[in-house]
From Swiss-Prot:
Protein family membership: Belongs to the RecR family.
Name recorded for this polypeptide: Recombination protein RecR
Gene3D superfamilies, alphabetized: 3.40.1360.10, 6.10.250.240, RecR Domain 1
Gene transcribed to yield this protein: recR
Classification via InterPro entries: DNA_Rcmb_RecR, Rcmb_RecR, Rcmb_RecR_Znf, TOPRIM_dom, TOPRIM_RecR
SMART domains hit by this protein: TOPRIM
Name of one Pfam family that matches: RecR_ZnF
One of the GO biological process terms: DNA repair
UniProt keyword list: DNA damage, DNA recombination, DNA repair, Metal-binding, Zinc, Zinc-finger
GO molecular function, one term: DNA binding
Amino acid sequence: MSKRIAGPEIERLIQLLAKVPGLGPRSARRAALHLIKKKEQLFSPLTTAMAEALAKVRVCSVCGNVDTSDPCTICTDPRRESATLIVVEDVSDLWALERAAALNARYHVLGGTLSPLDGVGPDDLNIKGLVSRIAEGGVSEVILAVNATVEGQATAHYITDQLVGLEVRVTKLAHGVPVGGELDYLDEGTLAAALKSRTAF
């Protein structure tokens, strides 16, 4: 049995921080200590920001993004290319694509992937909303920006089947060698995908 090194309030803070993706028990302890040491500069503003986020953040009823407005900033931006719809698994994927700033398109967040083993079926995802958005018209291309996992690819195939009969071009992200990547460090699946999706030079 491990010794208690702090009071229950600090232990609870560490336990909660450890639940944040990317933070294990050790990182959570470091983060908790840092927050406590920087109470005025960091801890108090952080708790205020978290309370405000909890009160104001909502899920966009159009695309599934999270924002302080509904519809979200992306959906209400008139400069967005409304004919292109990028389908992502989660909000974190949407944010990653936005950071890349490669396309000024609109998005649709599925809320996960099909996973029969985990009990996640089509009705558990925002697929009906996607089909409805496309059926309303105005979308000419759907980009399936899902992960290259078994579940991600199964979800992409299912969505493609659901879009049959609608006048929309369905594309997917290219898979292959990352920018700055060295072939020797890539796995066989990535190399095979890169060879199959090769382009003219």
